[in-house]
């Protein structure tokens, strides 16, 4: 399963990539934050999930989430330092499938990724 990491902090990007690859996911990093939703939607094969930071240079994670949900049903997990409950509520209402604050606990993050992916697979199986 392919997971896209949209994170501006190089240390966190590296940590996430290593964590995901150790859990046998394919991890792809986006480092250019211009037309990010379009970059993600044009990936072949399409990603199975996006880990999305909220605070990015040039483009907000909130805007990226909104654009992605207009054009795809790729699940999104916000992974952000924004701890305000209104930010979390806004993220979920705009289409994010989960909202995790930094610093994150790696086993909990992997568990929540697994839950979102299972829910998505189950939902897609029902459509078939």
Name these PLM-found stretches.
Residues 1-122:
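N-terminal/domain-start alpha-helical segments
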């Amino acid at each position: 399963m392919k997971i896209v990491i949209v994170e501006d902090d190089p240390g966190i990007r590296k940590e996430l990539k290593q964590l995901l690859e150790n859990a046998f996911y394919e991890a792809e990093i986006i480092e250019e934050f211009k037309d990010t939703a379009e970059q993600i939607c044009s990936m072949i094969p399409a990603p199975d999930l996006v880990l999305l930071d909220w605070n990015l240079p040039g483009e907000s994670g909130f805007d990226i989430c909104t654009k992605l949900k207009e054009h795809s049903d790729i699940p999104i997990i916000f992974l952000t330092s924004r701890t305000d409950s209104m930010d979390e509520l806004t993220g979920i209402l705009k289409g994010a499938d989960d909202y995790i604050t930094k610093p994150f606990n790696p086993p909990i993050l992997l568990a929540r990724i697994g839950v979102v992916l299972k829910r998505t697979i189950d939902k897609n199986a029902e459509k078939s």
